[in-house]
Amino acid sequence: GQMSAWYVLSSLGMYEAEPAGGRYWFGSPLFDRAEVTVPGGVFTITAENNSAANKYIQRVWLNGQPYTKPWIGHADLMKGGELIFEMGPEEKVWYCPDEPEAYADQRPAEEQRLFKSEAVEGEIARVCGLLTNERLRWMFANCFPNTLDTTVHYGEDEAGNPDTYVYTGDIPAMWLRDSGAQVWPYVQLCKEDPALQKMIAGVIRRQLKLINIDPYANAFNVAPTGAHNKTDFPQADPMVFERKWEIDSHCYPLRLAHHYWKTTGDTSVFGAEWVEAMHNIVKTLKEQQMKEDPGDYTFLRTTDRQLDTRCHVGRGNPVKPVGLIVSAFRPSDDATTFGFLVPSNFMAVTSLRKAAEILTAVNGERELAAECTALADEVAGALQQYAVVEHPEFGKIYAFEVDGFGSAQLMDDANVPSLLAMPYLGDVER
């Protein structure tokens, strides 16, 4: 019954994208006219000029009035009435996004904000002064400081060094990827705010410590609390919140550290912990090239979500050792289908080159820097040889995942790194 109703409504140009959400989102209808009997009478859907050529919505009317929402509510549908689609040959943004009732400040009260930065507040005022769109101004003023307001926990370690733990939002755990991305927009303001610079230095220091605890983990607890999924096998260190191996868990700390160094000139974060972390990163990335054997890393979880665990007793699908690096999971924390995750391998190349620059200029670690460069060169060459596939319509494109045997996954994932985000990250030219 429910599926039948879904098919009927979708054929009329109304899609229930959110199960039980009470909204039907508009798409191209299949018919010129249809009538549906509802509790309030009859609901008529008319698609003027509908045809294979005129398949895009141009305007919508509901009960004789212009309608600017991209959806209709269940209650309105049940009342009965008439919905008219005017169709045309070209895509058109005909609707208006939902507007809030008032552009109210959504930030926590000042005394409840976790970290305060005068430079960030100044940047909010500067940018909002440039924006003429009230909605964009409201969004920026609330979103830009959100990481500082709600997720940053700044302190000092036993030696008095900055130590910053960053929640990933609604989960009280620190993802290496997320924390590197969350504080990234603030690095540009470090020179204006010494406290902000110390906070970000604390993020880098904490990331390096966490990598040295377990270079295969993607998320960590603030202390050895043992908080994690109790069905995971093998069980992880009490500091580890989740042990999903993702290449970008190494790349984001390197990207952040390099950007911080280039912006501030501060080298205090590149001490013994940094060098140890770089040894662990290179060792792990080489292990996951799987040139000699699959290695020791496995991940299993009791779950009803197929992509929340790995197949083949936690080892994932086999790969051919061609120089690329296996990522057991994607940035979405979903398991990879084919282990060589292409966007993450691209990010590994640029991140290793950035690390080599620091190791040479700051630490004088030329041998370790050379290892980073050699690994980056190898992966870069393998990407051009194995990550490029021939698409029947678009020609040569990058696959999302490959296995080295010839299999390829042609898709993209919403989180970053992704194929779409590679230019944003600087991993490929635009």
What are these model-predicted stretches?
Residues 1-30, 89, 231-238, 243-246, ...:
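C-terminal capping/lid segments that line or modulate ligand- or cofactor-binding pockets
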Residues 7-15, 143, 206, 210, ...:
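Generic, well-ordered alpha-helical scaffold segments in large soluble proteins
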Residues 9-14, 119-132, 181-194, 252-267, ...:
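Well-ordered alpha-helical scaffold segments within catalytic/enzyme domains
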Residues 145-162, 225-233, 318-330:
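Active-site-adjacent bridging/hinge elements
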Residues 108-177:
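Low-complexity, Ser/Thr/Pro/Gly-enriched N-terminal "stalk/linker" regions
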Residues 172-200, 204-307:
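Aromatic-rich carbohydrate-recognition surfaces in CAZymes
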Residues 176, 215-216, 223, 232, ...:
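Extended ligand-binding clefts on enzyme/binding-domain cores
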Residues 1-108:
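Non-catalytic C-terminal accessory modules of carbohydrate-active enzymes
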